[in-house]
Amino acid sequence: MRTADLVIGGTRALALLSHEFKAGAAQRDLTGQLAQVPQWAQAARQASQSCVVLATGDPLCHGIAPYLARHLCVNALRVLPNLSTLQVACARLGLAWQDARIVSVHGKDAGEWQRGSAPGHGLYALAQAVRAHERLLVLTSPGNTPARIARMLLAEGLGDDFLMAVAENLLQPGERVHAELAPQEAAGMDFAPLNVVILWRSRPAPQPVRFGLPDAAYAQRQPEKGLITKLEARALSLARMQLRANSVVWDIGAATGSVGLEAARLCPQGHVWAIEKNGADHAIAAQNHAAFGVSNYSLHLGKAPQGLESWPDPDAVFIGGSGGELPGLIALALRRLRAGGHLVMNFVTFENLNAACDALKAHEAQGIEWDVTQLQAARSRPILDMHRLAAENPVWVVCAGKPASQERSGV
């Protein structure tokens, strides 16, 4: 640093260390100009000048070094790490951190976290991580503060499951560490701008069933029932959707939310987008969402296809209700599906089955392959001191697949 011809850094780092630079050294402030840094460094190298990029802590841990490595020759880089603020925070608290998950909540400020927030929210990765890890080390941002993180835990129903520690101004004047804060307390506190957060579980994480939940696990419309994809049809439909851990799923006509919520548990690194037009059913699906404890599920009140244009292209689409828009929804789903994706639909009436078959036939020339399975299940029922079988209504499960080699397209 003392011999560098060019020193690049943030406003604060340059001001803090400017007295160490050699006389005549050029300085570049990267604040708001990160994309220019590789060009500045490359230009200095071509001019046979030495260049130093200042970073705090370990630049290989959510720092600038990986970015520079992607845009410059790796062999041209020499990384000199310091202690990271996360290391220092754990040392202050005496906490082992080899098994902790590190999460950064830097990014565009999307405001307060709401249940069902989309993947673009700055707290989304953290909301997912708290479901899967016992201890988390969080690099905060000016918008996503410790207090907002605490409010996120409360919004997700995890206020009694985690404790927090907030380390402020580490290795600086005014250093302070708040240990064992309850989220309810931290949610209303103010902290110094320079801080990191540590989260750890105060009670064991639940290990929920991911697939094949009984119908009784879901709240349903009372006194009349029936607006639920029942266990047998749900299990077959989810199997035919060919879900992966990171799948993007659409659930059109969510009703109670049973298919979409189970898909969310099966796709912990993916996301489920659900829509329901009936207000009462939407409220029930929201109730089930709150009970299921998944953060990768967004539920919308509306009638498809309105609103679907803003959803990301799906790997799988489930249509449980069409609101009279079936042919158009099928065409939209097949157009938006990613290559190798699957469309699954459930029907109990001849009219909807015939409409679906006609719509799918019209897409056969595009390489769409489809089939129909009639599911006829019967469940045992007591009769006196014996048992009999009571038939459930037959369900047609209609499945269509998009060729793996076919390019996806937008709306």
Locations of regions flagged by a protein language model:
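Class I S-adenosyl-L-methionine
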Residues: 2-88, 263, 269-272, 276-279, ...
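Beta-strand/loop-alpha-helix module characteristic of Rossmann-like adenine-cofactor folds
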Residues: 6, 76-77, 86-219
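Class I SAM-dependent methyltransferase SAM-binding "motif I" and its flanking Rossmann-like core
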Residues: 57-133, 305, 366-390, 394-399
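Core SAM-dependent methyltransferase catalytic element
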Residues: 196-202, 382-411
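Conserved class I S-adenosyl-L-methionine
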Residues: 246-255
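Glycine-rich SAM-binding Motif I of class I
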Residues: 257-261
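S-adenosylmethionine
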Residues: 277-279, 298-379
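Conserved SAM-binding loop
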Residues: 285-286
